[in-house]
């Protein structure tokens, strides 16, 4: 699972001559929605287009919208690839003359959600609109996020959901980010966000990038407790004597599995269950054979979550 990756994700930069008075916004958008993300919101996320992603969306419905958002990112991470070739194309140029609209350099168009699923690839706008469509199908309110970077003409877009007053950005891969975590993520990728805005219909809301959560030892213990319960649920017993050193009496073989995830700076307790399930899944996939007992330790060291699983048989 990739937790950090540098994207060359490009916002569709527009060069628009001021529309003539007789060209309404509706007429304009009907001609350029493939190249203008604000216009695309009404055209790509209508009921007809959203229904086309039903086969995938129904598989990603979670117990609530947080769970659905997590499952969507997980699916996108496993099934889609970033379209580097498309991202390298020049941005579209839109010219309006009276009621006539001409678009030049049309290769970097906005895909519909169903097209992105079919192609299995896209750029940031394609990921964002697919995420919004999958959320909408499952009855979850989604938002478009427009990002501007310092000293960079190239922008970026993503999706977001609101959970108990906090926006969480959904950007192609796990995990969901709170605003501060998203700011840190881009710093680590070599870019500094100058401004991020939530777009909700015709309303633009500045995103406060100082809002964030700092994971603590209490979070580590709570996650550890959840993961322990998952292992107990498989019938394997917990033995606190297992510590990777001398094998206690009653066992013939011991095994230690260590997992380091660069995700501590992005952790938020709103997604505790999803994090715990994800970590458990990663551990379970690495276990070969059957074991009688286990012990588990999870700690936070800087920006890293360290998980140590001791097994014995």
UniProtKB/Swiss-Prot annotation:
It comes from the Archaea. Pfam families: DUF553 (PF04473). Disulfide bonds: none annotated. Belongs to the UPF0252 family. This is UPF0252 protein AF_0384.
